[in-house]
Amino acid sequence: AVISGKKFDVGFHVTTPSSFAVQIFIKKAVDSGSKFLVLETTSHALDQYRVFGIDFEVGVLTNVTHEHLDYHKTYENYLETKAKLLKMSKIAVVNRDDESFHQISNFKFLISKLVTYGIKKNADINPENFKFKTDLIGEFNKYNILAAIAACKELGISDKNIRKGIESFVLPLGREEVIYKKDFTAMIDFAHTPNAFEQILKSVRPMVKGRLIHVFGSAGQRDASK
């Protein structure tokens, strides 16, 4: 966790810590004078009530792909769990191009306001009505940026500051991280799902003149069907 430029250890290797820890970090943010707080909320956290009691101003759903089926068992269960975040939020921001959109739109009666973003279809926020520059590679990064744009605009952040944030953004370690670049290039990326592999490999392939060698491993005791 990063609060007012200071890093805090959230403990175990989990994206969203326990409800108690989440509230502690929220209090730290409030005490530090932070105006906005971004909380990555996993399906496990939603299902286990780790964010229970939090009134989200904006809930953002990036995409719903083949992930965590060892826990949720079916795609439908996974989608319904992810949708809980949107029901907890005053404003729901969703990917208009994602295959889950049709089902998500069926939850409209539970969502106060629905805002869409996308590249291929007629979305509220798209590269045509909000132009931006970025050095990040891959279509998936464009989608992530559009999601952030939609959320920021709903929070009243100016277009100038949004573009400034996009242009200055640096990916965290382990995300498209080039660790060697001499006689060949070596890159580390966190991709570990079928969709993530497809996206990163499609993005890197045009940049490679010769062979593209992909090495990956499995942590085990997870969704084996991946």
Regions found by a protein language model. Give the residues of each.
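Glycine-rich phosphate/pyrophosphate-binding beta-alpha loops
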Residues: 171-174, 188-199
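Active-site beta-alpha connecting loops in nucleotide-dependent enzymes
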Residues: 195-226
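Conserved nucleotide-sensing/catalytic segment adjacent to the nucleotide-binding pocket
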Residues: 8-42
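Short, flexible loop segments at the rims of nucleotide/cofactor-binding pockets, characterized by
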Residues: 12-18, 36-38, 69-74, 191, ...
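Conserved helix/coil segment N-terminal to the catalytic DExD/H
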Residues: 44-52
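Acidic, Mg2+-coordinating active-site environments of NTP-dependent enzymes
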Residues: 30-41, 55-186, 209-210
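Short, glycine/acidic-enriched loop or turn micro-motifs at the edges of active sites
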Residues: 43, 66, 98, 191-193, ...
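Short beta-strand-centered segment that lines the nucleotide-binding/catalytic pocket of NTP-utilizing
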Residues: 1-4
